[in-house]
Each structure stands twice: as structure tokens, then as C-alpha cells.
């Protein structure tokens, strides 16, 4: 085979999240490997080379930021990202990457470690993680792209801590009411954007107060 032929790359991610669904990510990696096995068993090379890739660190659940594995390949991981800590062990991303043999120095300087111009096409098989295909009774679908991920890890609303039993409404500045108002305004903006044809989803995650000043 001509070594100048650009390969088709198949794969997905090998990390998941709690309740991510059976075979989240892994289905795409296994599908690619099975294609390679089938090619070998049947002596079929195909018109283009086939390569399989497995990404790690694609979910945001562990470091608070998504696409770390693929981002590292394309020079998108910053020095600040490498200092993010793993939620269960407290190790930095740099430490975790170094443990598995990644070139952390190259990643820190945002070098391009993978030339995507050398790839003919990318194909990823993935499970359905939402209700749309089930609701529409679709056994499978072709997806041309996925939503990106814009995350604000910490949004703070400040108020005044007061005695909850004696301070009247006109003298209160409750931070929790401001948080509730902010979330409702986000929901309203979301509705307006959907009506304009924008495709996005919005989620408000963990809400908490200062343990020492609940009131």
C-alpha cells in the first residue's frame, strides 16, 4: 500500500462519568479495534489505511475541564490547565499525564503533537446519551458535530449575612435570592436563543452557601 495515503481514524474516549451510560466512549474504541480485527481475519486491507485512537481526559468530571486528551494533541492545553487537580486524588493534571508517559513539556508549550492534515477522515461510533433518538424511535443516526463545552466553574453572588429571624425584607440582601434570579434569567435567555434557532443546552450545577453564614 502507498504509505502516502492518509488514514481514516476511528476511536473515542476511554474515560467516562458517573451515570454516563453503558459503554460511554468505549464503544467507539472497541468498534475501531473490531474493524482492524476483521480486516486481518479476512485479509482485507481497504482502500485507505485504518487507525484507531483512544482519548483520555475528555470528560470534565475529573479535572473540571473537558477535552484534555484531544486538546493536548492539538496544542490547546495551557500551563494553567496542567495545574488543575484531579477531584479524587488531588494530583495535578501534569502529574497524571507524566505518569502515563505524556510529554508534559511539549504539552505545556502547546506544541502540536498530531497533524490533522495527515488524516483523511475521522469516524466515531458513540452511544446515545439523551432521550431524542428514543423519542423519535431511531435505532441509529449520523451526527456531523457535537456541542462544545463552555464552563464557568465558580460564579459568586454576594449578599449580607443577617439574622434570618428578625431582618425585614426591605433591609435584606440575600445572596441566595440573587443566585435564584440569575438561574431564572439564564433559563429565559436560553429560551430566547432557542427561538432564534441557536442550538445549545444550559445547566446550573452545584449551588451552595458559606457554611459559616447561611443566613
Region roles according to the model:
Residues 5-7, 47, 118-120:
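A general structural motif
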Residues 10-13, 19-58, 151-157, 167-189:
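Alpha-helical metal-binding/catalytic segments enriched in His/Glu/Asp
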Residues 1-3:
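A non-catalytic alpha/beta surface segment that caps or lines the substrate-entry region
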Residues 5-8, 13-17, 75-80:
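Glycine-/small-residue-rich beta-strand-loop submotif within the FAD-binding core of flavoenzymes
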Residues 21, 64-65:
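Short, solvent-exposed loop/turn and secondary-structure capping segments
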Residues 58, 67-68, 74-215:
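Midchain, well-structured core segments that form catalytic/ion-binding scaffolds
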Residues 61:
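Walker A/P-loop NTP-binding active-site region of P-loop NTPases
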